[in-house]
């Protein structure tokens, strides 16, 4: 009988995406979570993680469950004033009507409305008329204008509970897919399972950077991956969870593992919505890779450094500019 990997319920089971569906995750654990746990995870941490990657999702053309690529909130400068704008998935910039206040030569206050979309001017005029205000129509030359749209991105979420719990849940769900739900629900994995459900500290998931790993493991900015290994001698099961090729999490899945040794890697292509069967790396196996992270020269829990590394490599791969 299928059961929820988080609470053990056999009622109202739903698909569990190993990597979030809205981030292009295509690997699925059928009947993996109940509707309640699925909804709770989305509300408590996954939604913030997914929404934080809106700019990456738009640039890669990754659709959500409704088949829509996200639009982006941006800032443009027009006539010396900052104004909000929206960047649509196809690259078009939509600017809502803007209100400019200034003084004329006689010291009188002028209010000027600028519109950028057909129909907006008429709506402003009609609204003013309803208030008994007559607006003067002052047409300007129909000139094409170039504006720079600036998108402000905060990556703090990658080191908060939203990022850490999403990574831990991905590692745990992948383990359940590979080893079976019944085994994943055993006491061996209580710690990581309880963290996925309830959060809190200490966390089994951590951000990391490691020069040797970064030089030896190669996937694209459109790919996600999980590397996992269980070692009976050390009683440790641990995993690496990698988003967009350049954001790295280390997850302690269990410190009481006593089963047979195992190691595996799974990956998916977020742009193509398909599982990746072959990953390029210079490690002999997953055991060595994970031990290199756990025991080597690893830089831990640095949100800024991890965020800078992600966006620097993402921009380089796509030929973009990030500051």
Located regions from the model:
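N- or domain-start disorder-to-order transition segments that initiate the globular core
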Residues: 1-9
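Alpha-helical structural context detector biased toward long hydrophobic helices
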Residues: 2, 24-323
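Histidine-centered nuclease catalytic patch
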Residues: 9-28
């Amino acid at each position: 009988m299928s059961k929820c990997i988080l609470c053990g319920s056999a009622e109202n089971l739903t698909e569990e995406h190993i990597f979030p569906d809205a981030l292009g995750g295509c690997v699925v654990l059928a009947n993996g979570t109940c509707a309640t746990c699925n909804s709770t995870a989305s509300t408590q941490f996954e939604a913030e993680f997914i929404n934080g990657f809106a700019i990456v999702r738009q640039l890669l053309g990754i659709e959500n469950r409704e088949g829509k690529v996200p639009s982006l909130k941006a800032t443009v400068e027009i006539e010396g004033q900052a104004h909000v704008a929206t960047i649509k998935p196809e690259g078009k910039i939509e600017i809502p009507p803007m209100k400019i206040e200034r003084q004329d030569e006689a010291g009188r206050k002028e209010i000027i409305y600028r519109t950028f979309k057909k129909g907006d001017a008429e709506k402003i005029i009609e609204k003013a008329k309803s208030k008994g205000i007559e607006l003067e129509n002052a047409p300007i030359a129909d000139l094409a204008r170039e504006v720079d749209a600036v998108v402000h991105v905060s990556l703090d979420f990658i080191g908060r509970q939203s990022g850490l719990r999403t990574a831990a849940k991905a590692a745990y769900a992948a383990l359940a897919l590979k080893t079976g739900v019944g085994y994943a629900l055993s006491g061996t994995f209580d710690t990581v399972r309880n963290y996925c459900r309830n959060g809190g500290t200490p966390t089994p998931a951590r951000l990391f950077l490691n020069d040797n790993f970064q030089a030896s493991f190669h996937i694209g900015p459109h790919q996600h991956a999980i590397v996992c290994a269980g070692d009976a001698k050390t009683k440790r099961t641990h995993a690496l969870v990698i988003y967009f090729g350049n954001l790295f999490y280390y997850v302690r899945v269990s410190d009481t593992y006593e089963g047979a040794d195992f190691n595996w890697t799974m990956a998916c292509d977020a742009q193509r919505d398909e599982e990746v069967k072959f990953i390029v790396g210079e490690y002999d196996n997953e055991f060595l890779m994970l031990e290199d992270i756990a025991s080597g020269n690893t830089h831990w829990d640095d949100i800024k450094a991890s965020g800078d590394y992600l966006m620097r490599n993402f921009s380089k791969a796509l030929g973009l500019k990030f500051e």
